């Protein structure tokens, strides 16, 4: 239909410039399918596509999952682990259920998006990456921003390209 064609045209432009994309819509509208479509339309089609569901990972573990950690950074960290941001280098990092990301983690993600750099947990070296960020949510992020449950600066940084998927009913 016309709405989907319009969304795909916007997605095509987003893919060509590697801008951050925010995909919103009800559960089951195909947000991850759209993220994969963006990947297939752009120069990152043969590069890594790393998906992480922010709601499925404990807040205490999310930072080390995204950014990795150095040996000895915490109990049980016996050797260095690459984070998903590093694994996705030159490709796309898909952050599903971004609205579930804890507030204390949001400024770290914001900096990583803006600077395309980050530090592993327990590390001192800045690592540079080239990652397109695609985030998705089925929740009302503007309302969450108003209620101070989601950072406004991260919200606006993520929605450089804003795709709202219509319900499939």
Q: At which residue positions do the language-model features occur?
A:
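Short acidic-aromatic loop segments in the C-terminal HATPase_c
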Residues: 99, 114, 159
């Amino acid at each position: 239909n016309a709405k989907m064609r319009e969304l795909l045209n916007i997605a095509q432009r987003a893919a060509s410039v590697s801008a951050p994309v925010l995909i919103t819509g009800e559960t089951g509208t195909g947000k991850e399918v759209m993220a994969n479509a963006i990947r297939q339309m752009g120069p990152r089609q043969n590069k890594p596509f790393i998906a992480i569901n922010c709601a499925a990972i404990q807040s205490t573990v999310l930072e080390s999952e995204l950014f990795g950690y150095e040996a000895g950074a915490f109990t049980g960290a016996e050797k260095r682990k690459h984070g998903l941001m590093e694994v996705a280098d030159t490709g796309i990092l898909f952050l599903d259920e971004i609205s579930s990301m804890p507030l204390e983690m949001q400024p770290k993600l914001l900096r990583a998006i803006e600077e395309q750099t980050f530090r592993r947990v327990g590390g001192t070296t800045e690592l540079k990456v080239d990652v397109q960020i695609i985030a998705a949510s089925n929740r009302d992020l503007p309302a969450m921003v108003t209620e101070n449950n989601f950072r406004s600066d991260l919200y606006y940084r993520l929605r450089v390209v804003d795709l709202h998927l219509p319900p499939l009913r």
